[in-house]
Amino acid sequence: MERAEKREFVTELNEVFKASGSVVVAHYAGATVAQMNDFRSKMRAAGGTVKVAKNRLAKIALQGTDAEGISNLFTGQTLIAYSTDPITAPKVVVDFAKGNDKIVVLGGAMGTTTLNADGVKSLATLPSLDELRAKLLGMIQTPATRIAGVVAAPASQLARVFSAYAKKDEAA
């Protein structure tokens, strides 16, 4: 990689760190190409990205970003997983690491918060933003449905009473 390419890569990675909702750093030593391709495709399907970068370049790219506190994690063979949704990258990395012992979560960052490996794992257990929206919408709709049922119930009961009186009068 030439000097100009390195500068361009650092600039691109710096923008990624600034725009990402969360960044996860993990070791991938011993992972096969097929495993890495599978990991990348799962991350891409979830809306995230996985990059392998030189540690020195990643540390330079971290300067001036909110995630600057994770620069000490870049030792050995590291990969960077990131996404705009704060939950996506940790969730995919932790799920993939469960089935593959070659991927070891080191830590990460969410905004200005630096996370250790346990922090990333606990973040991965949270529901995604879309799941939270769906739950909130369900909570909002439930009372309205119940109110509509309560309001409609007396009217239907009155209709049944009038119907019973009408049938009684017809029979008499």
Swiss-Prot record:
GO terms for biological process: translation. Transmembrane segments: none annotated. It holds the Pfam family Ribosomal_L10. One of its GO terms (molecular function) is large ribosomal subunit rRNA binding. GO terms for cellular component: ribonucleoprotein complex; ribosome. InterPro entries: Ribosomal_uL10, Ribosomal_uL10-like_sf, Ribosomal_uL10_bac, Ribosomal_uL10_bac_type. The keyword rRNA-binding applies. Keywords: Ribonucleoprotein, Ribosomal protein, RNA-binding, rRNA-binding. It comes from the Bacteria. The keyword RNA-binding applies. Forms part of the ribosomal stalk, playing a central role in the interaction of the ribosome with GTP-bound translation factors. Belongs to the universal ribosomal protein uL10 family. PANTHER family: 39S RIBOSOMAL PROTEIN L10, MITOCHONDRIAL (PTHR11560). Part of the ribosomal stalk of the 50S ribosomal subunit. The N-terminus interacts with L11 and the large rRNA to form the base of the stalk. The C-terminus forms an elongated spine to which L12 dimers bind in a sequential fashion forming a multimeric L10(L12)X complex. This is Large ribosomal subunit protein uL10. It comes from Rhizobium rhizogenes (strain K84 / ATCC BAA-868). The gene is rplJ.
